[in-house]
Amino acid sequence: MVVLENPEAGPEEAAAAARVVPGGRRTLPLPGCLPALASSQVKRLSASRRKQHFINQAVRNSDLVPKAKGRKSLQRLENTQYLLTLLETDGATPGPEDGDLAPPAAPGIFAEACSNETYVEIWNDFMNRSGEEQERVLRYLEDEGKSKARRRGPTRGEDRRREDPAYTPRECFQRISRRLRAVLKRSRIPMETLETWEERLLRFFSVSPQAVYTAMLDNSFERLLLHAICQYMDLISASADLEGKRQMKVSNRHLDFLPPGLLLSAYLEQRS
């Protein structure tokens, strides 16, 4: 049975969790994922040769054969290939000790990791684990990255939508489907109804941009107007039958809600 480490443990607890194995070497557990294994001996070599050493070790541990046999073997192969892409995208060039007389490029992230003893121990610990444990570590790291992105909130690109030319009143109107645009141009639109729905959506999504707005609408023309408003505001709308009635659901595709500077009702009045 695998016992997970506490991902929120402080530096003192992490140091206490580290074990000393015969030979005086410490083993560091992978934080929040897996228990520690006895670390393997690593020669003190240059960063570039250490990289080659880890690559060779990864190939040996991946059980490479002409045709991988079994699910575990395939899983270990996929995990190893994923990790080796870190080296392929690193961009570091060989140094003078490898026969290159040109000045060495600045070390990349992978090269720096190879020269850090703590990272070396974690790398060896990872490569000595089974395919299932490696997959578990990768899933943990991926989930951690997603949770950090959610905690950071909306990106700057979304905050610049007010100045983005794609969000001018004219471009917002072009987002409306051709059929709905034709109806808005040819029909006599009840502006009071249009303004009422605009006010409801503005009030709702300004307070809860990630919530879902629902409304029961039996009037087909009113549903059409609501769809047009949603497309103009870059919202997502859908209607479905619910107990013999039509229910509208509206949601926001962005993390925050930034309505156009000119609402649809005002834009239509300008065009008339």
Curated annotation (Swiss-Prot):
GO terms for cellular component: nucleus. Residues 141-167 are annotated as: Disordered. Residues 191-254 form the R3H domain. GO terms for molecular function: nucleic acid binding. It is found in: Nucleus. InterPro entries: R3H-assoc_dom (IPR025952), R3H_dom (IPR001374), R3H_dom_sf (IPR036867), R3HDM4 (IPR039629). Pfam families: R3H, R3H-assoc. Coiled coil: none annotated. Disulfide bonds: none annotated. SUPFAM superfamilies: R3H domain (SSF82708). This is R3H domain-containing protein 4. Residues 155-165 have a biased composition (Basic and acidic residues). Keywords: Nucleus.
